[in-house]
């Protein structure tokens, strides 16, 4: 059994009707819905926002806080180009979900497993439902699954990275460049900004599958041999702050600690991005930004 999570199901996983196993989700407690969101623009007006006296102190290299209309509530070095680690898997999630066919099986190939940790441990020849793989990568950030989904989508990881750059521009992310699906530092030349990632956060909130996955606190991942692996969401704010509605973590030595997070309270939705934190303060600072945006 997975950790005891209030209000969450702990049913044992069952195989799907077509013989390809599926995980059993540990469902998050019901939370507020997101309102309609507006898409970012290359020419959006984002003059520097002077933090109010009661704004939280952010020690990370860059940060931004926006509302559901893209209005900036706080920013610090929001246009600095920085590595963003696994937070860019939100873009992977959007692209895979938009392609569709999530109920279809896909078979793991040998190159999919050539990934650095964090890894789920999938093996060549194994078959999984795409939705189960995508949910796992958004919850636990598994790099081998990210490679598999990228290859299945575009034929290869480099081709998928090129498609990521196209989709990023469509979302208004004009100051980002991606070279792989996972956020790892190789190949080099990969970067984004806090402002661009805030646009990605809005797009993630608009996508129903991604929105549901990123607020999932934990799930059982089921392998084809029937064994299961309990995994918990890497986003600690999702567990410490009851109004948090999820999003995505990231960490590499080069990027430091990165976090895209969101929260909802009293009909208001806010989105915070922190890049380049060198301490575990990323969690408390993210929560502080969310509370500030919600007027708490």
Region roles according to the model:
Residues 101-125, 216-222:
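Short, glycine/proline-biased beta-turn/loop segments that scaffold the active-site neighborhood
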Residues 4-7:
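C-terminal motif of bacterial Sec signal peptides marking the signal peptidase cleavage site
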Residues 116-149, 229-245:
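Conserved catalytic neighborhood of penicillin-recognizing serine enzymes
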Residues 78, 133, 275-276:
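Residue-level structural signal for beta-strand termini and adjacent loop
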Residues 69-70, 83-107, 111, 197:
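Active-site SXXK
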Residues 9-60, 156-296:
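Penicillin-recognizing serine hydrolase domain
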